């Protein structure tokens, strides 16, 4: 097992403290999350400038393998072209960069929340959350890790809005090229889990047109959110599914103006709003969310299935992952015990890619649930990514 299995130990320790902390949580309230500071605030003049250019950066300690980490604020765009600022992390390997610069791997993170204070760059366990990061850095790859729009920077966060995520991912790679040893690095791979799997696939879909100066060598995704309508429908009767549906509806009501009141029962609105304010960093956060979302088991939606109701039906289709240009190889990993992103949905997406002419490596993970799909596939993903940078023929399971 690769060293990112550290997060398993972190999660186990956090879970062991649940009994100790649970009374304090309900007497005193949840422990306060990190808050944004002036680093994340921008003016109109700050945002003006080329996409992917740096607004500011500051050092961040704690990266593995002697690497140098920077918290960054960079310029990007909304899907409609509106300029925005996005935050994230850039990690540069230790040592002298090779000729041509360090190759770059963009890390696309899984769900952390939908409000600004849920940005991974604010997280305590930031580096442990990046599946495969130690091996990537030891192997001589720089990492560009976006927070996504509206996390860190002012919200709302466009949760599961694929093109928004992808633009932020690509512009994080552009921002990384501002650092020594990366100026001439135009090749990158993207690797993500869950929400980040969706971001990775959308990155593959738009990279050629959005960033023609960059060369995307491969797309790797673990338990990606692909067919959003099917995933929402499959998960409505599970605790995790209700949580993610609530987050999606809350976010899209603000991003798209899709009425929350038309699909959520009046008695559930306060619970949905409360869940939106909670971040997900570790096992304890999941425990708190489970307790907070308990009322939704009795009263949640005012419609049978939001996926069949406009505008949600159209929005879910718009943000479903499509096929990629056939020349971009794809790595997919899927936990067979995943009850949030069902294996059949990922398998169906693989078949779509195959029919479109893509080269796809599919890794099935026995006895692996959703939360660990990224960590348990990270070694295989890093090896696969290394092969793409080395120019070796991509394995094909189609």
Regions found by a protein language model. Give the residues of each.
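Catalytic-loop region of hydrolases
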Residues: 31-100, 354
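Short, surface-exposed "cap/lid" segments of acyl-processing enzymes
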Residues: 80-87, 91-135
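Primarily recognizes the serine-hydrolase "nucleophile elbow" in alpha/beta-hydrolase
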Residues: 174-242
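C-terminal catalytic histidine-bearing segment of alpha/beta-hydrolase fold enzymes
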Residues: 304, 308, 313-314, 331, ...
């Amino acid at each position: 097992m690769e060293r990112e299995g550290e997060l398993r130990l972190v999660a186990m320790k956090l879970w062991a403290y649940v009994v100790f902390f649970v009374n304090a949580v309900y007497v005193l309230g949840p422990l306060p999350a990190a808050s944004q500071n002036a680093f994340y605030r921008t003016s109109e003049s700050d945002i003006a400038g080329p996409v992917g250019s740096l607004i500011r950066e500051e050092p961040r300690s704690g990266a593995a393998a002697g690497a140098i980490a920077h918290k960054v604020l960079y310029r990007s765009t909304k899907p409609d072209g509106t300029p925005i600022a996005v935050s994230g992390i850039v990690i540069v390997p230790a040592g002298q960069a090779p000729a041509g610069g360090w190759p770059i791997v963009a890390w696309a993170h899984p769900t952390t929340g939908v409000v600004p204070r849920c940005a991974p760059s604010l997280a305590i366990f930031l580096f442990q959350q990046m599946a495969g990061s130690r091996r990537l850095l030891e192997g001589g790859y720089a990492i560009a890790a976006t927070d996504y729009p509206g996390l860190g920077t002012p919200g709302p966060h466009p949760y599961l809005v694929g093109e928004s995520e992808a633009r932020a991912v690509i512009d994080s790679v552009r921002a990384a090229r501002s650092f020594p040893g990366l100026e001439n690095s135009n090749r990158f791979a993207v690797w993500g889990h869950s929400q980040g799997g969706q971001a990775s696939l959308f990155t593959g879909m738009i990279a050629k047109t959005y960033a023609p100066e960059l060369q995307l060598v491969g797309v790797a995704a673990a338990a990606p959110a692909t067919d959003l309508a099917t995933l929402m429908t499959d998960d409505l009767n599970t605790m995790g599914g209700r949580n993610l549906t609530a987050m999606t509806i809350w976010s899209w009501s603000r991003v798209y103006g899709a009425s929350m009141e038309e699909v959520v029962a009046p008695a559930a609105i306060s619970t949905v709003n409360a869940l939106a304010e909670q971040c997900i960093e570790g096992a304890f956060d999941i425990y708190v969310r489970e307790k907070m979302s308990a009322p939704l088991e009795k009263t949640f939606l005012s419609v049978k299935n939001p996926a069949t109701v406009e505008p949600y039906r159209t929005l879910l289709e718009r943000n479903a992952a499509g096929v990629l240009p056939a020349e971009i190889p794809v790595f997919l990993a899927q936990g067979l015990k995943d009850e949030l992103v069902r294996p059949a949905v990922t398998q169906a997406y693989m078949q779509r890619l195959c029919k479109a002419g893509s080269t796809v490596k599919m890794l099935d993970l026995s006895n692996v649930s959703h939360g660990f799909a990224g960590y348990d596939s990270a070694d295989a993903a890093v090896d696969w990514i290394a092969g793409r940078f080395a120019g070796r023929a991509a394995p094909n399971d189609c």
